[in-house]
Amino acid sequence: MATESHLLNADKINSGDIKDLNKLGVTAKGNQVTFKLTSPCPQFKYYLAFSNFMPQKQSYVEKVGKDYGTTSKNQIYSGPYLVKDWNGSNGKFKLVKNKYYWDSKHVKTNSVIVQTIKKPDTAVQMYKQGQIDFAEISGTSAIYNQTGSVKALTNQKIRQALNLATDRKGVVKAAVDTGSTPAESLVPKKLAKLPNGEDLSKYTAPGYTYNTSKAQKLFKEGLAEVGQSSLKLTITADSDSPAAKNAVDYVKSTWESALPGLTVEEKFVTFKQRLEDAKNENFDVVLFSWGGDYPEGSTFYGLFTTNSAYNYGKFSSKEYDNAYQKAITTDALKPGDAANDYKTAEKALFDQSYYNPVYYLGKKGLQNSKLKGLVRNSTGLNVDFTYAYKTE
């Protein structure tokens, strides 16, 4: 993120070319922080509201050391609330009003209880019983098809076959029919618009389709090219995602039905373990989700550049990299031209079938009618309690 913000020397420091952190384009004097950029970055204002760019109190960070941020007690706060009773893993804790917050006089709520409820049905029942005021009914991730250590996944025709054998409408209906929609491109709908008002998601959509006959033909040809008569793949997904099991079951069923010779196994691990497996390329196919950090295309297209830390499948394309770089540099101040660059990048992903967009996650929630001022965002911080309150 520091590199994509055009922060001076961030890329060279991350790569190790520069060791002196004082050369990073950030200086602090008193209560003023100054950032020096190498080129225009329209989305930089969004970065400044993101936690990665929040200044930390050096003396406290050094005092706490490796325990910094691991529990509510090992953290200091500058926002509207303090976190209480969080031990690093428990699913229920409190947000307590911070009297030192700069706008505390307008924060009406003294405390907020946050509780993790894994089962949607349980959340609904608790809502009906008055135990909670707001419930998100579903949450899941999008399937992400990548090259791994399996030889067959280095074959373009096999990857294309998997994409063509993915019934996106069926997955949504079977697993996440709570406001989610079938994916058409990498960026979700309503993330950003072109100057003419067209949705970026629709504009960049390269034409993903569900075509089992074409998928079967390509799969057969691909197997012949790699010298195999059959293929076994494992799909890795989050064990703590309420919809992941249904999604994986549906994909397994449709893939095996459409592609004779394919056997799909399921592997469910914790969210933390899934991240580790993805980072270490310990997967064949992994369900992977991403929420945008800000309302602009680079928050998604930055994922698949050759050197991106989130490019778990090690996809590499000069065409993709060049298009992305052009969008965030030369065309950064020209939204229409940047959209064309993103469309070029999307086509590179589509042509090589290095990933498989399945659905855009949408959430429906139950909210107490007495709860006012609660803000929900589509990017960045999902829920903002700053000015939320309950009426009598």
Indicate where each model-derived feature is located.
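Alpha-to-beta junction loops
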Residues: 31-33, 123, 128-137, 254, ...
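Extracytoplasmic/peripheral linker and loop segments enriched in polar/acidic and small residues
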Residues: 18-28, 160, 261-274, 301-368, ...
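Extracellular/periplasmic solute-recognition and catalytic clefts
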Residues: 84-94, 111-149, 173-174, 182
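Gly/Pro-rich hinge or "lid" segments in bacterial periplasmic/extracellular proteins
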Residues: 8-12, 19-21, 30, 37, ...
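Ligand/substrate-recognition segments at binding pockets and active sites
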Residues: 88, 212, 218-292, 363
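Long beta-strand-rich cores associated with HINT superfamily self-processing modules
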Residues: 365-392
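Alpha-helical secondary-structure segments
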Residues: 30-34, 80, 109-111, 129, ...
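Structural transition elements
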Residues: 181-221, 242-245
